[in-house]
């Protein structure tokens, strides 16, 4: 879990911004860790000669072994990408891949990093016209909220994944207790040069900086994107986060405040249990305006929720303050009542609406905050009706059996 403080640092560092295409809110919090090793980037309107409209860039970097690589990436990766020839040609997939590798090499060649053991994840989103390009290396995560459904734009890179494990072993490493060489809990990162061999190609390293890139064409169903480090995803599923954010939007809360509330609901009340909720936390929420202004975008989502168009966390989640919240008047920590419900589930990928009916058997219990929301009922109503009809028949038969047993018991008593 790493070293922790006796009391968490719950001060938030929040920013926001907008243009005609996106609105974003971003917040970070040190939490229980002895230092803050996360970093982020939010650049509106990057210039690209290949497209008419400006390009928007968002990224979250989760550092480990120190903060130097993460902070360097937060300051330099956007510029490396913008200067990349492939970026200026409009080849955004290859531009993202080569920019991650170029950043890795630039750090390696920098004298100030020669004795630095740190590394960082990177999850990046580019908005280019009506497309999203998501590049990811590590176990930070980017998720799209599409009418309340979590759609993964990235996949966590864990050493236990068979493809990742095969690369690690082929490069001379091993996986022990779910960690690279028994040490690192993720299998791709920028930095971490103790795991890199100058005789191997960048994509074949034990720990590679090469990202996976997902391209998504934005549809009218798509509402917002959430980028966050694993300090969030270890505590909430992708589906829970999307529903939490959606409820905050319905309540008219600013995106940076929703991010703050989410972190407060993830942070642990103490460090005595599993270690979940004790990490640094960073959350970036990006609204996809799609020709709406801010107020129209908020109203569109509120109208959808009012019409029961997709799952949303219950109304009380817009006001819930978790263990990390402090009063704005005196910075006094609020004592959380014993019956406060703080979800502590291991993160899981979201599921898109094209999934088959067996993709998630009971999302309302394991991955959803929406009261009464059932995956099958929402997307496979005919199947749900058949199951409900069968269940009702079972209940009727069960009630009949109970009644018969009662009659027999009365007769026996007489």
UniProtKB/Swiss-Prot annotation:
<dbReference type="InterPro" id="IPR001932">
    <property type="entry name" value="PPM-type_phosphatase-like_dom"/>
</dbReference>
<dbReference type="GO" id="GO:0007165">
    <property type="term" value="P:signal transduction"/>
</dbReference>
<keyword id="KW-0460">Magnesium</keyword>
<keyword id="KW-0479">Metal-binding</keyword>
<feature type="compositionally biased region" description="Basic and acidic residues">
    <location>
        <begin position="350"/>
        <end position="363"/>
    </location>
</feature>
<protein>
    <recommendedName>
        <fullName>Protein phosphatase 2C homolog 3</fullName>
        <ecNumber>3.1.3.16</ecNumber>
    </recommendedName>
</protein>
<feature type="binding site">
    <location>
        <position position="62"/>
    </location>
    <ligand>
        <name>Mn(2+) 1</name>
    </ligand>
</feature>
<dbReference type="InterPro" id="IPR036457">
    <property type="entry name" value="PPM-type-like_dom_sf"/>
</dbReference>
<keyword id="KW-0963">Cytoplasm</keyword>
<keyword id="KW-0904">Protein phosphatase</keyword>
<feature type="binding site">
    <location>
        <position position="62"/>
    </location>
    <ligand>
        <name>Mn(2+) 2</name>
    </ligand>
</feature>
<comment type="similarity">
    <text>Belongs to the PP2C family.</text>
</comment>
<feature type="binding site">
    <location>
        <position position="230"/>
    </location>
    <ligand>
        <name>Mn(2+) 2</name>
    </ligand>
</feature>
<dbReference type="GO" id="GO:0005829">
    <property type="term" value="C:cytosol"/>
</dbReference>
<feature type="compositionally biased region" description="Polar residues">
    <location>
        <begin position="390"/>
        <end position="400"/>
    </location>
</feature>
<feature type="binding site">
    <location>
        <position position="63"/>
    </location>
    <ligand>
        <name>Mn(2+) 1</name>
    </ligand>
</feature>
<dbReference type="Pfam" id="PF00481">
    <property type="entry name" value="PP2C"/>
</dbReference>
<dbReference type="InterPro" id="IPR015655">
    <property type="entry name" value="PP2C"/>
</dbReference>
<dbReference type="GO" id="GO:0071470">
    <property type="term" value="P:cellular response to osmotic stress"/>
</dbReference>
<keyword id="KW-0378">Hydrolase</keyword>
<dbReference type="GO" id="GO:0046872">
    <property type="term" value="F:metal ion binding"/>
</dbReference>
<dbReference type="GO" id="GO:1903753">
    <property type="term" value="P:negative regulation of p38MAPK cascade"/>
</dbReference>
<feature type="binding site">
    <location>
        <position position="279"/>
    </location>
    <ligand>
        <name>Mn(2+) 2</name>
    </ligand>
</feature>
<dbReference type="InterPro" id="IPR000222">
    <property type="entry name" value="PP2C_BS"/>
</dbReference>
<feature type="compositionally biased region" description="Basic and acidic residues">
    <location>
        <begin position="401"/>
        <end position="414"/>
    </location>
</feature>
<dbReference type="GO" id="GO:0005634">
    <property type="term" value="C:nucleus"/>
</dbReference>
<keyword id="KW-0539">Nucleus</keyword>
<comment type="function">
    <text>Dephosphorylating regulator for many key proteins. Has an important role in osmotic stability and cell shape control. It may negatively regulate the osmosensing signal transmitted through wis1 map kinase.</text>
</comment>
<feature type="region of interest" description="Disordered">
    <location>
        <begin position="313"/>
        <end position="368"/>
    </location>
</feature>
<dbReference type="GO" id="GO:0004722">
    <property type="term" value="F:protein serine/threonine phosphatase activity"/>
</dbReference>
<comment type="subunit">
    <text>Monomer.</text>
</comment>
<feature type="domain" description="PPM-type phosphatase">
    <location>
        <begin position="23"/>
        <end position="288"/>
    </location>
</feature>
<keyword id="KW-0464">Manganese</keyword>
<dbReference type="GO" id="GO:1990439">
    <property type="term" value="F:MAP kinase serine/threonine phosphatase activity"/>
</dbReference>
<feature type="region of interest" description="Disordered">
    <location>
        <begin position="380"/>
        <end position="414"/>
    </location>
</feature>
């Amino acid at each position: 879990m790493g070293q922790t403080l006796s009391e968490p640092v719950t001060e938030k560092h929040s920013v926001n911004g907008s243009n005609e295409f996106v609105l974003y809110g971003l917040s970070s919090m040190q939490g229980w860790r002895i230092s803050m090793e996360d970093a982020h980037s939010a650049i509106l309107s990057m210039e690209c000669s290949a497209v008419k409209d400006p390009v928007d860039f968002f990224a979250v970097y989760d550092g480990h072994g120190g903060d130097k690589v993460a902070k360097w990436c937060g300051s330099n990766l956007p510029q490396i990408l913008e200067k990349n020839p492939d970026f200026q040609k409009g080849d955004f997939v290859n531009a993202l891949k080569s920019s991650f590798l170029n950043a890795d090499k630039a750090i390696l060649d920098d004298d100030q990093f020669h004795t630095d053991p740190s590394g960082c994840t990177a999850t990046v989103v580019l908005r280019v016209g009506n497309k999203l390009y998501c590049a990811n290396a590590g176990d930070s995560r980017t998720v799209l909220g599409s009418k309340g459904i979590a759609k993964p734009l990235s996949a966590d890179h864990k050493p236990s994944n068979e493809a990742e494990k095969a690369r690690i072993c082929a490069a001379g490493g091993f996986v022990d207790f779910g960690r690279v060489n028994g040490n690192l809990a993720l299998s791709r990162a920028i930095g971490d040069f103790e795991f890199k061999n100058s005789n191997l190609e960048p994509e074949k390293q034990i720990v590679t900086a090469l990202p996976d890139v997902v391209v998504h064409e934005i549809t009218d169903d798509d509402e917002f994107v959430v980028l966050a480090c694993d300090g969030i995803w270890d505590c909430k599923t992708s589906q829970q986060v999307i529903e939490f954010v959606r409820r905050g939007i319905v309540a008219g809360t600013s995106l940076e405040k929703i991010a703050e509330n989410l972190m407060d609901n993830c942070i642990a009340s103490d460090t005595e249990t599993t270690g979940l909720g004790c990490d640094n936390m960073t959350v970036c929420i990006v609204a996809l305006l799609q020709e709406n202004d801010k107020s129209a975008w908020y109203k569109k989502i509120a109208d959808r929720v009012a019409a029961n168009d997709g799952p949303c966390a219950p109304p009380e989640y817009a006001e819930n303050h978790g263990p990390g919240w402090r009063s704005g008047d005196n910075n006094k920590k609020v004592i959380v009542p014993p019956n406060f419900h703080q979800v502590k589930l291991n993160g899981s990928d979201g599921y898109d609406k094209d999934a088959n009916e067996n993709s998630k058997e009971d999302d309302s219990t394991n991955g959803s905050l929406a009261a009464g929301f059932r995956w099958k009922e929402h997307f496979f109503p005919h199947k749900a009706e058949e199951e409900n009809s069968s269940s009702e028949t079972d209940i009727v038969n069960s009630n009949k059996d109970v009644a018969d047993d009662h009659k027999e018991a009365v007769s026996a008593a007489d």
